């Protein structure tokens, strides 16, 4: 936007360099940097606002540059002169007091909005501490923007291409670069690592919470165990399994359910016959784990406990309710543990 003022207004206006524009952010695109800002600098056309400072960045280490910039929080822009490193060479000198800048690849062309012309070149560089032989890579990065020069004729068309050879010969004995190569815009920034460290959380067993079904109150409900815990518990109780007897069972409770509650200390919510009589499932509704007893194992447990006629110890109540099909649901047993 161009501001036009009459003489009276201009006398009462602060200097442009002293004006701070609240909310202003400088985020130019690559095309805007080379086609507007860099081109105006090469043509010696100044701007009313000093958005990009003129600094020889190779006289400073990158961590000292942010305080020299006109603005910027994470990116800083500078007009930088491109001095030759060697005579008869267009390669600039990129050595600083504490290290050096090293290119990470070749120049990338920047095209006009209509994508028909190459209007600039972009190079990425990374800063290394120390000297070239033993340099240590840092997180400081730079994007260098420059206009195409006569030596970059393959990137763009030059009206004076026939004079290219003569122009280069005239500059072979000088460290001064052609006007297009004399200045570059350098964007300085520090690369941040987005990888966040993740804490290693140790895995632990979480005991399930038994919901209140509003049908019965439990003062001391035994904890449901996972199948692995049940099998481990079985191995410690093998010497306490009672000898089988021939007396008929006097309880409607299934032998396997009694074995689970008394021999293993397991409180289970659902005893399910799968419809074929092949297996009895003891399901832990809190975790989804299950202890599956095969038909042979079920018969074995029936033989072990089927003849018991005495009162079942440590059992207060048992409510049985028949459901459709071959399913039988039994409420959890309450113990005096």
From Swiss-Prot:
Residues 20-191 form the NAC domain. The keyword Transcription regulation applies. Its main location: nucleus. It is found in: Nucleus. Keywords: DNA-binding, Nucleus, Transcription, Transcription regulation. InterPro entries: NAC-dom, NAC_dom_sf. GO terms for cellular component: nucleus. Coiled coil: none annotated. The keyword Transcription regulation applies. Gene3D superfamilies: NAC domain (2.170.150.80). GO terms for molecular function: DNA binding; DNA-binding transcription factor activity. The NAC domain includes a DNA-binding domain and a dimerization domain. This is Putative NAC domain-containing protein 94. It comes from Arabidopsis thaliana (Mouse-ear cress).
